[in-house]
Curated annotation (Swiss-Prot):
Keywords: Detoxification, Flavoprotein, FMN, NADP, Oxidoreductase. Coiled coil: none annotated. This is NADPH dehydrogenase. It comes from Geobacillus kaustophilus (strain HTA426). Substrate binds at residues 28, 164-167. It comes from the Bacteria. GO terms for biological process: response to toxic substance. InterPro entries: Aldolase_TIM, NADPH_DH_bac, OxRdtase_FMN_N, YqjM-like.
Amino acid sequence: MNTMLFSPYTIRGLTLKNRIVMSPMCMYSCDTKDGAVRTWHKIHYPARAVGQVGLIIVEATGVTPQGRISERDLGIWSDDHIAGLRELVGLVKEHGAAIGIQLAHAGRKSQVPGEIIAPSAVPFDDSSPTPKEMTKADIEETVQAFQNGARRAKEAGFDVIEIHAAHGYLINEFLSPLSNRRQDEYGGSPENRYRFLGEVIDAVREVWDGPLFVRISASDYHPDGLTAKDYVPYAKRMKEQGVDLVDVSSGAIVPARMNVYPGYQVPFAELIRREADIPTGAVGLITSGWQAEEILQNGRADLVFLGRELLRNPYWPYAAARELGAKISAPVQYERGWRF
């Protein structure tokens, strides 16, 4: 069977062998707490490349030490990180996958000891510390940190950069009126709340000419928060700035009850793809080959991002191929076991 899931996809000169993407998922495995790649990362990510995932995106990687979600996160704030990341890139590419990295700053959701920063001095919840409101100098330094991270990612050999603007972390905190109470040019109107992300995109694009993704939370799940419709003009602006794909997730800007079910976020990706005319990635409880194929065949998204399913089964592409009646190449070492 000819499938879309196992057809190549080209984006800004990079051709992926299929439409399956491993979502960035924090592993919290830097036991040295210095942001360096560890043995776990060198096993975990290449295993999914062996499993025939087309694109693997490395977890949220801190552009500053304080920008990490936890002390056990990967980092890209120092040139000392480049060698380990370069080794990881080589291991993944050796097994036929493309590799990206998600550049991130946790903002008020950072659990690293010390001062935390955010657009406004508004805590995430009643049990969270109150962050320091960022000054203009803080904003400039953080934009520069994203650019420096992009430069290091390029030196390490990554194929794709994704900017993390979702899940209640720093960039998302600027975008949402629930967390951004500023009265200057970085707060208030939708245009002002987008300004920080816009500056990050421009700064990254100055040093990075490869495929650029942005992950968003397309719904705040709050009556006073943002909806997928609100993200359409943002996505149009991203496209104008040279973003190639919007990775569409949702939630986590404030504590909220979410109705979670298979494919629950796919309509957000579909709406943004249709109304902003930009490629999108769909993510969220996509578990079967037929489900992934339906999303692609019906033009609801361009790529399918898998998270927990690839934690359960590093060889999910093989299972999906069998389900769809498609034939894919097996690693030579596994040919005796991969039967179609």
